[in-house]
Amino acid sequence: MIKTLTNLRKQEKEKFVVPKGVQDVIPITAIYDDGIFQIGKDKFSKTYKFSDINYAVASREDKEAMFLEYSELLNSLDSGATTKITINNRRLNRLDFENNILIPMKGDSLDEYRKEYNKILLEKATGANAIVQDKYMTISVNKKNIEDARNYFARVGADLIAHFGRLGSQCVELETDERLRIFHDFYRVGEESSFHFDIKETRKKGHSFKDYICPDSMEFEKDYFKMGDRYGRVLFLREYASYIKDSMVAELTDLNRNLMMSIDVVPVPTDEAVREAENRLLGVETNITNWQRRQNSNNNFSATVPYDMEQQKKEMKEFLDDLTTRDQRMMFAVITFVHTADSKEQLDNDTEALLTTARKHLCQFGVLKFQQVDGLNTVMPFGVRKIDTFRTLTTESLAVFIPFRVQDIFHENGIYYGQNVISKNMIIADRKQLLNGNSFILGVSGGGKSFAAKGEIENVILSSDSDVIIIDPEREYSQLVRALGGEVIHISATSQNHINAMDMTKEYGDGANPVILKSEFIMSLCEQLIGGSNLGAKQKSIIDRCTASVYRTYQQNNYQGEVPTLQDFRAELLKQDEPEAQEIALAIELFTSGSLNTFAKHTNVDTNNRLICYDILDLGKQLMPIGMLVVLDSILNRITQNRAKGRNTFIFIDEIYLLFQHEYSANFLFTLWKRVRKYGAYATGITQNVDDLLQSHTARTMLANSEFIIMLNQASTDRLELAKLLNISDLQMSYITNVEAGHGLIKVGSSLVPFANKFPKNTKLYKLM
């Protein structure tokens, strides 16, 4: 017998003790502050949680790369320890779920919309899987004392985190209370929100940690067990197919039930594995030689070696080649599975569904008879293994049981964006949790861009105290804005609404003198007003001097009272002696006292409303460049004000490509895009002209640096450009090719998942959208 296996069984050999209570079923003997559990005389375990990656929707090449990287991870496992890979399906606790996603009432006129939105969210939650899939890796090792165990786990943990990082998966060590929560949530389904554990408090009171996690009662029958009012059954993989698809684990864990699947891995040192393989090959060759000798003694000199002997020899040679030339390791594996249900009938039906799924892959699950308690302790991430149904595998054949499927996005206190097409779970994202919360919504006309933007605007206004500012060149948002109590500001040469281009708050300068920053803005404005030509050094000096002069009184009054206007600025220019000043004054006359003087008057609209929509549909060609600059500067004013109040600002710019047609507004927008994050603001660009957008290097950089992108149905040329820029696989591309409105891909940080967002039509909110 292989030495590794002999030593392992010797280490794990324990005297059987009949459990006197439910606590005795739990095989943990001691717990430590750093998440290490003692699970035997000299055995310690530690659990690491790793995140899912987009394996199911990756291209063939990417899948191969992930598979090889996962094989590398398995190869790196220490042969002196046992590794348990666990997939845990747990149902979301309805109370926690509702607290996370439902919008609280505020006692204002918008409560009717909040109630309606909450009703929609609850319907979506009921129709969704409502299952969260957690993935763990538990390492258990024999050490003389806890200090040795700590040193070992510190070394192994760093390697694990690095390997998972190369896969694109985030791996973290679990603390003591996090590990105990796994067992509590399994044993006490429905009581998830009641878990509270403080190790110091527990020690002080002399309580056992097991009291916090164990169920009220446990009964073990021949082929199932009862845990409180729930039923459970442990299965094991009895027979493996010669060829197994990499989707098997995903299909087995796709059942919409509380369940766990564990793969126990015992790596064998390569020298020992090679020696064992050589001995086995020698044994097969000896059998063949003996068979031929017997045939020769019977004068049967032309007899061919039997097929089964030839096969054995061929397979052993391949196995030896794998170990010696293909960088494979020999592994022992045990696959166990536990699932629970509310009734025995449901349990039997679920068992049959699992057995059918395994048979589809030509594998066979077996029910553990009279071993349910051992099976349960094996499948759960304690770090123990009581089931000995080992199967010898190579790294490659073990890697087929790859635990990855698709990323789910569920941020606490996030916004609903749709449902994951693959896992059927709700996509709840919070842009505030991203490194860069700026966003783009891209898609062909009729793909659902405005609908997606309006959905987010509704959610922000109803669920938070954040401000929302919209730039609307198509007059699409007016109805929604008015219904939500917002202010629509019509900007044109003939409009009665005016925004003062020289509006400035104390916070405008980001801690420095705000006039310095405003002076730069007025220089850009003058360049536009003069006709897009660059200003000379003299002209810039004059503008800077006049800007400081017109703001002096306003600054001395601590930014209170009447703000100067462009008319005051022109009057100041006319006071200057230099001929250049007179030239600038003449050039901007049309925009200060002429027919296009809409931005040279005092602001007469409510720019302090929580929800503001700048309607720029009637802004003519002459006013468009300066109009966009003034609107963007007004937005910057508002953002800096909100920053001082600790309030977030969401900016939505529809048909954003229009801003990139003018150099100054494009550069101003680029600066805004870089700066808003530190101001607690989040900008969203909406466009159907992706190809045009990507012609601008500025826009391309902005898109590449945005961590939140909603891609709906795309035109063929746009798809290719996006695929190159965002590294989208062909399979992922199919989710933005000829799909219905509201379907596509959503990029949240490094996650890229296919989604569908269907909104009920018989609602007030839908009519507003």
Predicted features by range, described:
Residues I53, R60-S79, R90, T253, ...:
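P-loop NTPase motor domains
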